[in-house]
Amino acid sequence: YVPEDRRVFTDLSVMENLETGQKAGADGAVIWTASKVFDLFPEIARRRDATAGTLSGGERQMLAIARALMGNPCILLLDEPSEGLAPVVVQRLGETLSALALEGLTLLLAEQNKALARRLANNVVILETGHVVFTGTFDDLDRMPELLQRYLGV
């Protein structure tokens, strides 16, 4: 799980943050190691000994995702991963999440950035106060301008 507010341990180093998330997957497999997440996120690899409190918002988001991957999940839950990030960082994040999906990792995304969500999602579900008000594809959603306006403001 990657929470909305990029919860990282600010007094720990990048490497120590990763170690706090390390565990085998449900099937006992260890797919994600520090070396593999550093390959995925070279930006934080260069700062492996820096305390997380010195990282930028984008670097903290990368660290939060990397730490979640260290738990070797079969599903990665992401709550508003693009919130508060610069467009160039959102672009990089989208590329990384797309690569993870192509590797076969299931992503469950709560995201208001329609462009990022469209890039990553096979299916769309819109909830209102816990009730499903729409389920379908982005193409289906595009044919429903009233839903786009009401829930996405477009």
Description of each model-found segment:
Residues 14-32, 40-45, 49, 152-154:
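ABC-type ATPase nucleotide-binding domains, specifically the catalytic core motifs of the NBD
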Residues 51-55:
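Conserved ABC ATPase signature
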Residues 68-69:
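ABC ATPase C-loop
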Residues 72:
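Conserved catalytic motifs of ABC-family nucleotide-binding domains
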Residues 76-80:
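Catalytic Walker B motif of ABC-type/P-loop ATPase nucleotide-binding domains
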Residues 91-103:
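Helical segment within the ABC ATPase nucleotide-binding domain
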Residues 109-112:
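H-loop/switch region of ABC-family ATPase nucleotide-binding domains
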